[in-house]
Amino acid sequence: MKVTLVGNGRMGQQIAGIVNASDANVIHKVLDVSDAVTPEVFEGSDAIIDFTVRDAFLANYKAMIASGVPVVVGTTGWDELMPQIAEEVNAAGSSMLYSANFSLGVNVFFRTLREAARLIAPFEQFDIALSEQHHTGKADFPSGTAIKAAQEVLNNNPRKRTIVRELEDGKKLQSDELQVSSIRLGTVFGVHSAIIDSESDTIELTHTAKNRTGFASGAVRAAEWLAQQHAAKPGFYTMDDFLNDLFSA
């Protein structure tokens, strides 16, 4: 598989290392955030992997879609535009797979959280909140992974209806609000936790990333899957689609 990387930052370099270490895959081209992106630059590619920033992705995604090459996107911060972009992908007969986090471990965390949120829903004595920690260089908060985790709770526990990112001084948290707190500290790669609490006990679910290898290898595996999927059934996909296929194999 010939891969074009869009983004040459820390994640892009990690992905390049994994691709180059593989006998089956090769880096076809690497584009920096500042490079001009047109559909033609992707000629000869079997897959595109985008790890840039929101503004760069929004400036480039139309060219990536128009190229007809399947696109794996790890850039976060554009969730509100996802329905629109998914429509554009489907209308063009192209393929795109988006995930806020490609780590297999963190996606097991999502599925465990999903089940926990569902199980405690009938029992009002259990409350739930989320927290995330990242290095001081991470600009967005909460992280895309934390937002995905929060959505899992909202989708599976009707007692929680809205996400609260920051508490206002003097205002109490309402019972239907899900607090998602953020910490920026040192060089932390990423820690995501769900805390379920009652008067009797506390349950904690935590995923801790030790390095970027899990994210990068997951993105490459997702690109391999999407390249095959594109040939049979083009469309807009998420990590859940890939994992459902992977776990059922």
Curated annotation (Swiss-Prot):
(S)-2,3,4,5-tetrahydrodipicolinate binds at residues 135, 144-145. It is an enzyme of class 1 (oxidoreductase). The active site is at residues 134, 138. GO terms for biological process: diaminopimelate biosynthetic process; lysine biosynthetic process via diaminopimelate. GO terms for molecular function: 4-hydroxy-tetrahydrodipicolinate reductase; NAD binding; NADP binding; oxidoreductase activity, acting on CH or CH2 groups, NAD or NADP as acceptor. Its main location: cytoplasm. It catalyses: (S)-2,3,4,5-tetrahydrodipicolinate + NAD(+) + H2O = (2S,4S)-4-hydroxy-2,3,4,5-tetrahydrodipicolinate + NADH + H(+); (S)-2,3,4,5-tetrahydrodipicolinate + NADP(+) + H2O = (2S,4S)-4-hydroxy-2,3,4,5-tetrahydrodipicolinate + NADPH + H(+). Keywords: Amino-acid biosynthesis, Cytoplasm, Diaminopimelate biosynthesis, Lysine biosynthesis, NAD, NADP, Oxidoreductase. It is found in: Cytoplasm. One of its GO terms (cellular component) is cytosol. Pathway: Amino-acid biosynthesis; L-lysine biosynthesis via DAP pathway; (S)-tetrahydrodipicolinate from L-aspartate: step 4/4. NAD(+) binds at residues 32, 74-76, 99-102. It comes from the Bacteria. The keyword Cytoplasm applies. Its EC number is 1.17.1.8. Pfam families: DapB_C (PF05173), DapB_N (PF01113). Catalyzes the conversion of 4-hydroxy-tetrahydrodipicolinate (HTPA) to tetrahydrodipicolinate. Belongs to the DapB family. This is 4-hydroxy-tetrahydrodipicolinate reductase. The lineage of its organism: Bacteria, Pseudomonadati, Chlorobiota, Chlorobiia, Chlorobiales.
